[in-house]
Amino acid sequence: MVKIVKRIKKIREGINFNELYTLTDAVSMVKERAVAKFDETIEISMNLGVDPRHADQMVRGVAHLPNGTGKNIRVAVFARGDKAEEAKAAGADIVGAEDLFETVNGGTINFDRCIATPDMMPLVGRLGKVLGPRSLMPNPKVGTVTTDIAGAVKASKGGAVEFRVEKAGIVHAGVGKASFGAEQLIENIKTFVSAVIKAKPQGAKSEYIKRVAVSSTMGIGIKVDLVTIRSE
């Protein structure tokens, strides 16, 4: 307990929690404080001026991070025939149809992204109660229901990050690892923020982005000045 308190105190040192830091400074501070024995994930959290209980204020999309996430993404694909072979050739970890349905329906989910061809959706749709709560249900709006299976698999493996606003109006995602260079993280963060801005719904309030913060897995949030994300 004493060690934990000391670690938290050390992480908080030098941070003014009332200040908005430039993106460059915030990334530097987060990296300096990511001292765990594993490669911590660098995360972004955005408070949005939306109420997702209203359909016209839902925020959902996908950001294609130029430098990847640093995570080995396991991809499952629901497809048959040539499309199943296309998925395997593109590097999908799990490919199947009715057999994969039975596996998932039985509670075995050992993948991070789920892709399906349009003809498979009547079957996959029956897995809504299993995949939905885990944000794994394929959706054409984020490119996971598609005939371009190879492209979708490669995008998922290469840094595609899905996002969806939560009940409190918060969007968050991992945008890299502490081992990434500062410029790599900055590029990824800018790309993610741009994707969220592009996903602004018609019903959003005038102040769409209220707060942006970055942190590491074991660290604390450092608030970022949105202007510097757009200008640096």
Curated annotation (Swiss-Prot):
InterPro entries in alphabetical order: Ribosom_uL1_bac-type (IPR005878), Ribosomal_uL1 (IPR002143), Ribosomal_uL1-like (IPR023674), Ribosomal_uL1/biogenesis (IPR028364), Ribosomal_uL1_3-a/b-sand (IPR016095)
Assigned keywords, A-Z: Repressor, Ribonucleoprotein, Ribosomal protein, RNA-binding, rRNA-binding, Translation regulation, tRNA-binding
For this record, an example GO cellular component is: cytosolic large ribosomal subunit
Task: Name a GO molecular-function annotation.
Answer: rRNA binding
Q: Name one GO biological process term.
A: translation
Under the heading NCBIfam families, the entry gives:
rplA_bact (TIGR01169)
Q: Which family does it belong to?
A: Belongs to the universal ribosomal protein uL1 family.
**What is said about its interaction partners and assembly?**
Part of the 50S ribosomal subunit.
Q: What does this protein do?
A: Binds directly to 23S rRNA. The L1 stalk is quite mobile in the ribosome, and is involved in E site tRNA release.
Q: What's the protein name? A: Large ribosomal subunit protein uL1
Species of provenance: Bartonella bacilliformis (strain ATCC 35685 / KC583 / Herrer 020/F12,63)
